[in-house]
């Protein structure tokens, strides 16, 4: 079972590291091409392209300039510990043990606009470049055209290495659009998390992102290898709803949070 998640905009390069193991990202030659494009951008370009404040634009112009082809523990940290958005709040990687990290290294991948596909312990220099960014590049007008089949091919390598042909899609639509499901050597299963609000169950972004992280952790901690076991997920009050699920979409619901 291979899990795919989105990255996060919020980053943490300050907290103490809970593991000193690390690996090198595999698609740096592609990242380098994107960095060369991004280094041509002014702060005003970045603010407009990424729809961010001048302060965040300045920060990221600096990051593009400082980015180095050499990834070391001094200028980078493991991706699973550097990302800090809602998904990663649910994942709580800082409390995983060494065996969990080893398992995650084989069974978890993070999609990324700049790095393409990251293993949990891959070193990552700080950046902001979302997959949906309309950044003109040598291969087209956006990052989906830039990455083409590269991410899908890397996922197929990971699927082959970890032993079955099931991919659990815990990524957002924006990121999973960078994957070509028909070319994957796997059955794609997408968990859907719905929260009760005013008497109706719907996907509420903040809760759903956190739940995706919790499910990734559930798979890692419990070494889940079958879809049947996946339906036993019950973290934070979620429960599986069989009658609303299909072979490719697993629906989980939760009562209103007070």
Swiss-Prot record:
InterPro entries (UniProt xref): YaaA
Protein family: Belongs to the UPF0246 family.
GO term, biological process aspect, one: response to hydroperoxide
Name of this protein: UPF0246 protein VV0659
One Gene Ontology cellular component annotation held by this UniProt entry: cytosol
NCBIfam families listed in its UniProt record: PRK02101.1-1, PRK02101.1-3
């Amino acid at each position: 079972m291979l899990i795919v998640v989105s990255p996060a905009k919020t980053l943490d390069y300050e907290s103490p590291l809970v593991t000193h193991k690390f690996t090198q990202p595999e698609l740096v030659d592609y990242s380098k091409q994107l960095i060369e494009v991004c280094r041509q951008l002014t702060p005003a370009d970045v603010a407009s392209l990424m729809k961010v404040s001048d302060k965040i634009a300045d920060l990221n112009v600096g990051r593009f300039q400082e980015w180095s082809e050499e990834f070391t523990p001094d200028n980078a940290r493991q991706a699973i510990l550097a990302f800090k958005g809602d998904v990663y709040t649910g994942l709580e990687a800082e409390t995983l043990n060494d065996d969990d990290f080893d398992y995650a290294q084989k069974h978890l991948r993070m999609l990324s606009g700049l790095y393409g596909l990251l293993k949990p312990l891959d070193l990552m220099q700080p950046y902001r470049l979302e997959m949906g960014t309309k950044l003109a590049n040598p291969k087209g007008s956006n990052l989906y055209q830039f990455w083409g089949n590269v991410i899908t091919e890397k996922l197929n390598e990971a699927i082959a290495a970890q032993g079955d042909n099931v991919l659990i899609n815990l990524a957002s639509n924006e990121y999973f659009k960078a994957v070509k499901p028909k070319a994957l050597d796997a059955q794609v299963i997408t968990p859907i998390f719905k929260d009760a609000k005013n008497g109706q169950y719907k996907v509420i972004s903040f809760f759903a992102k956190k739940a995706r992280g919790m499910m990734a952790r559930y798979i890692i901690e419990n070494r889940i290898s079958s879809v049947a076991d996946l339906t036993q997920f019950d973290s934070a009050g979620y429960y599986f709803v069989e009658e609303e699920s299909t072979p490719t979409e697993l629906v989980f619901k939760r009562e209103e949070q007070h």
